[in-house]
């Protein structure tokens, strides 16, 4: 029942698990004393920021009108996720960093 909504939630779960693995990779690198290279940092920042906002926006859509009301946490989560895209360099800046590295 409501297969379309189930599919959207499943996609969100896939993005969440990929993001979790990226964070674990950075944490393991830090724990081992290995420096994370700047390109990996830019890739993670870009991916996590974009997917975080995409998933939170999707959640707002799934909540319908309630997704925009302050009574539900999904509205705040989307605002916070937008800051994740912008803080520390926008996704466009991260793309430029990655592209410059790839063009070497």
PLM regions: where:
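Alpha-helical interface subdomain recognition
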Residues: 1-104
């Amino acid at each position: 029942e409501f297969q379309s909504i189930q599919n959207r939630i499943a996609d969100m779960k896939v993005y969440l698990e990929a993001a979790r693995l990226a964070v674990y990779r950075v944490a393991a690198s830090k724990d081992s004393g290995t420096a994370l290279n700047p390109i990996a940092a830019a890739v993670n920042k870009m991916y996590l920021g974009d997917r975080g906002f995409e998933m939170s926006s999707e959640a707002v859509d799934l909540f319908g009108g309630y997704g925009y009301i302050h009574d539900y946490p999904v509205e705040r989560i989307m605002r916070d996720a937008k800051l994740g895209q912008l803080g520390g360099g926008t996704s466009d800046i991260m793309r430029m960093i990655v592209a410059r590295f790839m063009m070497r």
